[in-house]
């Protein structure tokens, strides 16, 4: 199950489509009945979360928070992905991308972090990007890189 919390009340975002797309990606990744929360926030909230949890006092597009539920419950709960739609919009304009496609990409990127993927070193980054490209292609979104 994918839950979208659109706390900024951005009516341009089709929450239903985003939720369904991410649910299909979860199935594609063999995560079955996993639960995922996507929280759409403003710049103030993402900057505060980035400062508190990553000790970086700056804006970012997406943050991922793994579930802190007990291990026996945790299998089905992926965690939370927090996305700043203002940053994603700016990036989509700068990179000449569709806002909805870039938003979907950032949600998938955050979800992959919850599944253990990272991009700290070049090898891991390439593996994560390749998986993102493959997933995005299956849902009709061109290579974002």
Curated annotation (Swiss-Prot):
UniProt cofactor(s): Zn(2+)
InterPro entries: MetalPrtase_cat_dom_sf_prd (IPR023091), YbeY (IPR002036), YbeY_CS (IPR020549)
Cofactor info, note text: Binds 1 zinc ion.
Domain of life where this protein originates: Bacteria
GO molecular function, a single term: zinc ion binding
GO biological process: rRNA processing
SUPFAM superfamilies with a match to the protein in the record: Metalloproteases ('zincins'), catalytic domain
Parts of the chain that traverse the membrane: none
Subcellular location: Cytoplasm
Keywords: Cytoplasm, Endonuclease, Hydrolase, Metal-binding, Nuclease, Ribosome biogenesis, rRNA processing, Zinc
GO cellular component: cytoplasm
EC number: 3.1.-.-
Positions of Zn(2+) binding: 109, 113, 119
UniProt similarity note: Belongs to the endoribonuclease YbeY family.
PANTHER family linked to this entry: ENDORIBONUCLEASE YBEY, CHLOROPLASTIC
HAMAP family: Endoribonucl_YbeY
Role, per record: Single strand-specific metallo-endoribonuclease involved in late-stage 70S ribosome quality control and in maturation of the 3' terminus of the 16S rRNA.
Name of protein: Endoribonuclease YbeY
Organism for this UniProt entry: Ruthia magnifica subsp. Calyptogena magnifica
Annotated gene: ybeY
